[in-house]
Amino acid sequence: MKRVSLLGSAAIFALVFSACGGGGEHQHGEEMMAAVPAPDAEGAAGFDEFPIGEDRDVGPLHVGGVYFQPVEMHPAPGAQPSKEEADCHIEADIHANEAGKDLGYGVGDFVPYLRVVAFLQKHGSEKVQKVMFAPMNAGDGPHYGANVKFEEGLGTYKVRFEIAAPSHDEYSLHIDEQTGVSGRFWSEPLVAEWDDFEWKGPQW
């Protein structure tokens, strides 16, 4: 998720105040502008995101993985732990890259109707935890995500996102000569993975 500053309205008010006044009032307005603190890029939204690792490009998709505090959702996805039960919320931010143009997407467009599953495997363990991601919207737009409880606790994990194309009965592509796209959806899930994700517990 991208952070959104809540300080914009204060800055706009100060600017209007300084523009309307004259002389000493104008100077006072400039002082007000100077007093408005600059947004903190890391904390402007009131929370911090933590990357799972570097973003990945797989096929026509640019995939980012981040986590932060558990969230409340409505309606609540049935298979996910609640905000109170979960350790964190994990997001897959999936947008089209340059290759996505062949499917009719613009670079940076959110790609809808995907089926995204995460697999978490702690180093040294044979157990693989499967997490079904759901499409959802936050204040900054759509993503795929889930509240997650790490079943094997703190440690280093391999994290794997498997991203299946939209199902044939839910999403179609134009393929005629006049209006069609040149690309086709992938037949096997695309994979974005990180081998050394360190889960240290809540950092917020």
UniProtKB/Swiss-Prot annotation:
Topology of the protein relative to the lipid bilayer: Lipid-anchor
Covalent lipidation (S-diacylglycerol cysteine), chain numbering: 20
UniProt KW Hydrolase keyword: no
Compartments (UniProt record): Cell membrane
Signal peptide: 1-19
Gene3D superfamilies (alphabetical): Periplasmic metal-binding protein Tp34-type
InterPro entries associated with the record: Metal-bd_Tp34-typ, Tp34-type_sf
Pfam families assigned to the protein according to its UniProt record, in alphabetical order: Iron_transport (PF10634)
Lipid addition sites, N-palmitoyl cysteine: 20
Predominant localisation class: membrane
Keywords from the named record: Cell membrane, Lipoprotein, Membrane, Palmitate, Signal
Top-level taxon of the source organism: Bacteria
PROSITE patterns according to UniProt: PROKAR_LIPOPROTEIN
GO CC terms: plasma membrane
Function in brief: This antigen is a pathogen-specific membrane immunogen.
Family per similarity comment: Belongs to the UPF0423 family.
Designated name of the protein: 34 kDa membrane antigen
Originating species: Treponema pallidum (strain Nichols)
Lineage of producing organism: Bacteria, Pseudomonadati, Spirochaetota, Spirochaetia, Spirochaetales
Gene: tpd
